[in-house]
Amino acid sequence: LGAWSFGLIIGAIVARSVAIECSKKPFKVHYPLLVASAYSGFVIWHMGYSSSTALFVATPGHLLESRVGVIPVTETILSSTNITLALMGLLLITVICPLMKPNEEDVIEIDPDLIKDKKPTIQKKASMNMVERFENHRSLNIFLGLIIIIYIGITYNQNGFYLNLDIVSWTFLSLGLILASSPIHFISLINNAAGTVGSIILQYPFYSGIMGIMATTGLMQVITDWIISIATPETLGFFAFLSGGLVNMFIPSGGGQWAVQGPVMIEAALSLGVNPSVVVMGIAYGDQWSNMIQPFWTIP
């Protein structure tokens, strides 16, 4: 709920760490289920702080502002309905995952080759000049991180509490800077992470091509028009959920999906007299739901 990328990565790290510790003790754990359980938390990401769809429509100047205005997060991710559903989803995952445990003879433990850890190393010289000492000292990180936090605080003080894409991006940048031990350490972490997401970066041009085809050929319009033809004001949110899950299989990026699907579904909401926030969260729920079978995020 805090950050989809942070949760996805931390979940994988925790699953791996738990499996490694279990391998050192007489305790057998089914590694595929452990990984799947950690990944399943991803199913509620669009309900949280980094929801790209909700943040998109909460950002002044967004693509659809002339039609729906700015939709505050209090109507989307901070609504009582969304918070309740998020907690229910989290509880359901916690209950279901342990029930999927296989028989002891079918347990697959972690591969010993995966236990070898690779951590970014920073080599410090015995004698460093002023610039080198500066880039290996934490003071610059803390200074920059605090400046960003102060800026966010001033923004909240002037405009009240609200979230948009810029605020979320600045928040996580400030946290990354403060938690890193030095500027050079922060850079090394970024470089190391870039190697991890390389397979995702490689896929983006292909999925962008699919997104372009769906947008320019009218395929997205056809799918959405069909949904609208059978939807009512009471069921539009549900059909937005189904269409969001379907389109996500072709456009896995939440922001990219909304750019293609959002305008059409918003027009549907306006024509049926439905609150646009219902469609926004319907598409968001569909996106996060089908991520469980979307291979894009699991390849790394």
Describe every region a protein language model picked out.
Residues M47-G48, Y204-T217, Q221, S277-M281:
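Hydrophobic alpha-helical transmembrane segments in multi-pass integral membrane proteins
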